[in-house]
């Protein structure tokens, strides 16, 4: 619950379980205060967990098997999950968490470094305080958020996706550099303080804004398509301006 990025706050990432030792079929536990409850699971180090916290798998099964944990207070509770370091969590199936307080809670996720969260399925969060939320998204660097599906962020304090809506909104967006925002679907922002806030828009340079459908803003403090910024950036209806006047036309008209 004290994680700076993980927001579920449901206590599911704690160390409570039903007993220490090698309690699973063919499991192995060594060192001190460890629990290996999955089939063929391994728990090493100090106060680690490999396998489900509330199930002692006495028979061979394919849904609680092959977990590996090593370090201090790490949890590899997902099926075939791997966790190492300090206070890391690999709770998704085939998840990998390494480092310090990094969480990999989605299936087939990777969380490496410090205080990262790979939330959606097949996400990657590497660095410091990164959050890969939408399925298939990637967050690299420091304090980046990849909110939509298949989003990509790299650098420092960048945001891809529409964080004012549910996880997965404004997919396929890319934000790179320093404090850039790509909140429209299939949008891209790069460099510094740039904002691509509508569908398929691109913003590059310093402090530029691209808020119209498919528009490009480049340079310093330039804006392309200034207009109704409250329009849903995840809707393909779009809008266009001609000579400063709103036309209401669909893209391509």
Give short role names for the model-derived ranges.
Residues 1-253:
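Periodic small-residue-enriched repeat registers in elongated scaffold domains
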């Amino acid at each position: 619950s004290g994680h700076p990025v993980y927001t579920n706050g449901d206590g599911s990432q704690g160390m409570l379980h039903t007993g220490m030792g090698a309690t699973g079929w063919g499991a192995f536990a060594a060192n001190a205060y460890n629990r290996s409850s999955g089939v063929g699971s391994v728990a090493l180090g100090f106060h680690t967990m490999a396998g489900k916290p509330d199930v002692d798998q006495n028979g061979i099964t394919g849904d609680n098997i092959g977990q590996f944990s090593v370090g201090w207070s790490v949890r590899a509770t997902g099926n075939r999950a791997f966790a190492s370091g300090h206070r890391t969590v690999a709770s998704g199936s085939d998840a990998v968490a390494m480092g310090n307080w990094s969480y990999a809670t989605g299936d087939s996720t990777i969380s490496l470094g410090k205080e990262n969260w790979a939330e959606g399925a097949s996400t990657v969060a590497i660095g410091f305080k990164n959050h890969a939320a939408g399925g298939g998204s990637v967050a690299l660097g420091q304090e980046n958020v990849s909110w939509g599906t298949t989003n990509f962020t790299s650098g420092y304090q960048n945001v891809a996706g529409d964080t004012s809506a549910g996880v997965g909104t404004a997919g396929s967006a890319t934000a790179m550099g320093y404090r850039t925002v790509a909140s429209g679907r299939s949008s891209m922002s790069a460099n510094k303080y740039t904002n691509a806030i509508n569908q398929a828009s691109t913003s590059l340079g310093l402090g530029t804004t691209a808020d119209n459908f498919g528009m490009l803003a480049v340079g310093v403090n330039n804006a392309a398509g200034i207009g109704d910024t409250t329009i849903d950036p995840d809707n393909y209806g779009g809008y266009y301006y001609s000579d400063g006047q709103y036309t209401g036309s669909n893209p391509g008209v």
